Each structure stands twice: as structure tokens, then as C-alpha cells.
Amino acid sequence: LVNWTIINHVLDELPLPGYDRYQPGKGVWAPSIRWHDGKLWVCFSTPDEGIFICHTEDPWGKWSAPHCLRQARGWIDPCPFWDDNGQAWLVHAFAHSRSGIKHKLQLFAMAPDASELLGEGQIIYDGCCDLPTLEGPKVYQRAGWYYIFAPAGGVENGWQTVLRARQMTGPWEAKNVLFQGNTSINGPHQGGWVEGEKGECWFVHFQDLHLYGR
């Protein structure tokens, strides 16, 4: 988890109108990566167009063209999830700059082959009172519980929240588990839960450094 090498790119270009030019504040936001059915899946949003997904059987090889799961403005940070029983889901957040919402997570049932989102979504958590700027959800299943790791409070001074429930549709309970504390590393923001080969658990997240990026 310490030393990384770039081996490939999921997208050579973004095949959407206008992206042959520089587009500040647009483009690919907060992708998530998952392994299912012998394939790697990368799901991402473009905040003005919708939610897309790509897949490959070989991360060093060719990735599929981005497939649009749903056209929508202001839907961001999607995370697909395949349940142990074969049910597929997708959770996403909202961009306040496009939707006027910044504190809710929405859940969709998804076709198992990730070809489409099914039906209308449902809001599974509303952090209006306790979790402002709730975003970046990542979904996991462990020991009979479903977990959603999601940062709140904004990238500069926020914290990491974990939601858990016995079923994906809820009800979800929330606990704030990680704060900046006295360190100089702001955040912690939009991280992922990783379990090592020996069962040890790690949390990997980004740090916002303004002009230097994240």
C-alpha cells in the first residue's frame, strides 16, 4: 500500500462533447474500483452528464468504452457493489453546485451485469443535521453487516464517517471514526477500506493540498 506504479489508463479520452478542451471543475470525479465476475470495474461520474462504468479482464490491457448507467446532473462519487447473494447495487452522492444537495446518499438496484440502474433510487441517509457535505461513499460487506465509508464536512476540515446496516436499504446508523486531530494532514477524505493478506485492516485516503492537488 506504500509504493505504487501506474500501469495503464481506463480512459484514453472522455468521449463526451466539449472534453477536447480544458474544462475546469468538470470531467471524471471520484472513481471507484471493484472486482466482480472475473473483471475489474471502474465506476465514475462526470458531474454534468451522469454516471458511467468501464470494465476489463486485464488491467494492463484494453478497457471497455464508458457505458452510461444513468444520465443525470449533479450525481457524483458512484460506488457499485455486488452482494454475496448476487444482488447488485450502486450508491452515489450529490454535488451541491449542480443539484443543490450536499448531504444525502442515494441507493439504486443495478443489473448484475452493470448494464443499467433499475427503477427509481431511494435516499438511504440524510446528513442534513449531523453530516454536512456527505460524499464519496464506498460500500463493503463484512460479518453480516453492510458498511458505507463516507467523508463529511468538506475536504479541508472534514472527517470520516462509517454507516452500517443489516441490509442495503437500511436503516443505517452512523459513527464518525476518524478526524484530523493534531496532525498536519488535513482531511481525512474519500478513502477506501483495505484488508491485507493477514487480516489486518487499513484505510487509504487523500489529502487536499490546494494547488498541488489531492
Task: Give the ranges of each region predicted by the language model.
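Carbohydrate-active catalytic/glycan-binding domains of CAZyme proteins
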Residues: L1-R214
